[in-house]
């Protein structure tokens, strides 16, 4: 006698309301909370956020907010930045495991030893780094303002640039400066296949290939436009082209499609037939986790005060130099 085994069904979480959008809106009013979301978040999180942006825009919003609670739909270093700027506010990250491969590629102890080899160098650190690395830096930058920041530093001042080597190379090309680079990288932006991108450009000869500067030089050399996520979004709206191959995390395509619904956006392919160009850390955040974080006021981002204070100054320098 045979019996049919039914597939195991996951029980419905009784603590999750059916209408999450309404429940989150109610909690937002109750807590006087603001939801900040990065472009790489899932579309449903982007749609409920009060502000969607790149690292620079999110930092500016975090610095300016009057909310009592900041819910950061992004990764750990972004929520840390919000806490550095707002020590008296409650900063929530829906999933504390939402880390960053680029930030992880620059361990504080190793970077301290690296920095000690260049005592006369100014340290410019990409915002995609831990609070400890920010605390060891002189100025923070983002992909939106890295070139602008470096151009404001006297030419006779030697510079360490950390942690992203690809962004560092791009800044060197744009500024003509010789930077000492920390050899870190982002797993997402290093997975794009030059060969497959060339094939796509042959398949879509009228398409524009646009790319984030965290991509490798072999990929960037084919791009008709290179810029931060916000810059890519703006360019795709203003360009006369109607088809784009986009080399960055594909979460940005949700906003591109909303802003230009009649245009076509094709995610740049990865080396393997996988979703490797989706950031696994960004995708840990879900609408359900966002709701529970607000309801439970946890997980909360906390920092040792001496680290926070030391990290604040280079961020404030960036915000001032970005005006």
Swiss-Prot record:
Subcellular location: Cytoplasm
Catalytic activity: iminosuccinate + dihydroxyacetone phosphate = quinolinate + phosphate + 2 H2O + H(+)
Pfam families per UniProt: NadA
SUPFAM superfamilies in alphabetical order: NadA-like
NCBIfam families xrefs: nadA, PRK09375.1-2
GO MF term set: 4 iron, 4 sulfur cluster binding; metal ion binding; quinolinate synthetase A activity
Cofactor, how bound (note): Binds 1 [4Fe-4S] cluster per subunit.
InterPro entries attached to this UniProt entry: NadA, NadA_sf, Quinolinate_synth_type2
A GO CC annotation given for this chain: cytosol
Binding site for [4Fe-4S] cluster: 100, 186, 279
This protein's UniProt keywords: 4Fe-4S, Cytoplasm, Iron, Iron-sulfur, Metal-binding, Pyridine nucleotide biosynthesis, Transferase
GO process annotations (BP): 'de novo' NAD biosynthetic process from L-aspartate
Enzyme nomenclature, EC number: 2.5.1.72
Species: Gloeothece citriformis (strain PCC 7424)
Lineage: superkingdom: Bacteria
Chain residues that bind iminosuccinate: 38, 55, 126-128, 143, 212-214, 229
Pathway: Cofactor biosynthesis; NAD(+) biosynthesis; quinolinate from iminoaspartate: step 1/1
Annotated protein name in UniProt: Quinolinate synthase
Cofactor(s) required for function per UniProt: [4Fe-4S] cluster
Chain's role: Catalyzes the condensation of iminoaspartate with dihydroxyacetone phosphate to form quinolinate.
Family indicated by similarity: Belongs to the quinolinate synthase family. Type 2 subfamily.
